[in-house]
């Protein structure tokens, strides 16, 4: 009899455990209701401008902690269709300095005049500081007679036939400014006729 009682109690206890397992409330894991962070994609813009690095210079700055070495980059950009610009950037790395210079150049874009044949309308003289640049029109097929910073400006501006001559100081920044100042002095035949109160045929 005792054995039967023990078996019954064991069976009853097993039934109770099964019932508890079945009737036990299912605890759901807390769902993450916080809004997910949005992922932003960096927009990539295609630029029609070409870049030309004119000069890279290493500069140092003396501080209490010692000398700090950095690089400066001078860049000229243009679309070869009359738009040109220049800029300078500084950073501890050369690529970063070039990127800053390009960004600065995009903020300093100017539009220059040119003939249909890719030359200038007349002789001009540009000056900035002690730098002087003379620009002369050239016949078709001559090419770009220029060097250094002057060539970078006129080539990226879209000129194909032009004579140039640089005099005075040869600091790249001043030469670039002098070249652009000269290009901005151009007058088209219509503008000259208007200033002289004459028709295009009379000029």
Swiss-Prot record:
SUPFAM superfamilies according to UniProt: dsRNA-binding domain-like, Ribosomal protein S5 domain 2-like
Cellular component GO terms, alphabetical: small ribosomal subunit
The keyword RNA-binding is assigned to this record: yes
Entry keywords, A to Z: Ribonucleoprotein, Ribosomal protein, RNA-binding, rRNA-binding
GO molecular function: rRNA binding; structural constituent of ribosome
Pfam family membership, one: Ribosomal_S5
Domain S5 DRBM: 49-112
GO-annotated biological processes: translation
Domain of life: Bacteria
InterPro entries the UniProt entry points to: Ribosomal_Su5_D2-typ_SF, Ribosomal_uS5, Ribosomal_uS5_bac-type, Ribosomal_uS5_C, Ribosomal_uS5_N, Ribosomal_uS5_N_CS, Ribsml_uS5_D2-typ_fold_subgr
Domain comment quoted from the record: The N-terminal domain interacts with the head of the 30S subunit; the C-terminal domain interacts with the body and contacts protein S4. The interaction surface between S4 and S5 is involved in control of translational fidelity.
Subunit structure: Part of the 30S ribosomal subunit. Contacts proteins S4 and S8.
PANTHER family membership: MITOCHONDRIAL RIBOSOMAL PROTEIN S5 (PTHR48277:SF1)
Known function: With S4 and S12 plays an important role in translational accuracy. Located at the back of the 30S subunit body where it stabilizes the conformation of the head with respect to the body.
Family that this chain belongs to: Belongs to the universal ribosomal protein uS5 family.
Protein name: Small ribosomal subunit protein uS5
Native source organism of the sequence: Ureaplasma parvum serovar 3 (strain ATCC 700970)
């Amino acid at each position: 009899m005792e054995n039967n009682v023990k078996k019954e109690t064991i069976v009853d206890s097993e039934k109770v455990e099964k019932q508890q397992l079945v009737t036990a409330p299912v605890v759901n894991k807390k769902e993450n209701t916080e809004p997910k962070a949005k992922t932003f994609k960096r927009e990539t813009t295609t630029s029609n401008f070409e870049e030309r690095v004119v000069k890279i210079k290493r500069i140092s700055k003396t501080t209490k902690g010692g000398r700090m070495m950095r690089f400066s980059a001078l860049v000229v950009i243009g679309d070869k269709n009359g738009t040109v610009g220049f800029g300078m950037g500084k950073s501890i790395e050369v690529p970063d300095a070039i990127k800053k210079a390009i960004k600065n150049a995009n903020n300093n874009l100017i539009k220059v005049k040119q003939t249909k044949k890719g030359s200038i309308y007349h002789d001009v003289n540009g000056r900035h500081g002690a730098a002087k640049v003379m620009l002369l029109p050239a016949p078709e097929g001559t090419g770009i007679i220029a060097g250094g910073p002057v060539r970078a400006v006129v080539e990226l501006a879209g000129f194909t036939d032009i004579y140039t001559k640089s005099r005075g100081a040869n600091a790249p920044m001043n030469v670039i400014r002098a070249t652009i100042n000269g290009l901005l002095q151009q007058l088209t035949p219509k503008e000259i006729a208007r200033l002289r109160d004459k028709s295009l045929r009379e000029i």
